[in-house]
């Protein structure tokens, strides 16, 4: 059996950028003896996480962990976080380094702007994924998360309500397209922002 490695295999731009950010902070903080934390493991790679731990980097696993920290640097990983987490880091006087993927940041801005303008927000993605949890935390209006065509079929909202649809950056593009089609048939006033990362789409096509 022949095994081929896809041209697009490997870590995406956002993850590489986040990892590089942590190593840069380690380098810059050597003389200061400053404790560096990442909000969640910076990458799903045990070797990299272990190497960072050996260099003194600690992992925060949620807001309860964050509450106990009184000094140091907190690095936000590529998945991003909700607005409340940013506020907590700043209010505790910690140094904030934001390594959120720029594509995820764009979703945060879109959700914030549209929700403030009165749109209900639909996030197509996995509700348990940290990226989706972070996106939800930027909405200031009704927010719905769905992951299947069945959920899209069942979705219902007051007819006069405006909708803005975004997606988890790693969601399957064909599935997203189909779910949007289902929602659009319900004749709501809808704005669709395709926020699936180009790298994700390329990998799905290559697969």
Q: Which residue stretches match the model-derived regions?
A:
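The feature marks the mature, well-folded catalytic cores of soluble enzymes
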Residues: 1-207
């Amino acid at each position: 059996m022949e095994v081929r490695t896809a041209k697009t295999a490997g870590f995406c731009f956002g993850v590489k950028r986040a990892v590089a950010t942590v190593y840069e902070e380690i380098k810059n903080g050597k003389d200061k003896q400053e404790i560096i934390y990442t909000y969640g493991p910076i990458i799903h790679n045990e070797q990299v996480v272990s190497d960072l731990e050996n260099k003194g980097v600690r992992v925060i696993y949620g807001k309860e962990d964050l509450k106990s920290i009184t000094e140091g640097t907190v690095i936000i990983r590529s998945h991003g976080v909700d607005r409340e987490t940013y506020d907590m880091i700043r209010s505790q006087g910690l140094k904030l380094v934001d390594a959120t993927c720029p594509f995820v940041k764009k979703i945060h801005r879109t959700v914030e702007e549209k929700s403030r303008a009165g749109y209900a927000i639909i996030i197509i993605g996995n509700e348990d994924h940290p990226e989706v949890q972070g996106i939800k935390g930027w909405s200031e209006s009704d927010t719905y998360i769905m992951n299947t065509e069945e959920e899209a079929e069942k979705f219902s909202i007051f007819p006069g309500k405006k909708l803005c649809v975004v997606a988890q950056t790693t969601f399957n593009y064909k599935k997203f397209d189909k779910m949007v089609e289902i929602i659009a048939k319900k004749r709501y006033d809808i704005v669709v922002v395709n926020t699936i990362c180009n790298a994700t789409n390329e990998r799905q096509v290559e697969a």
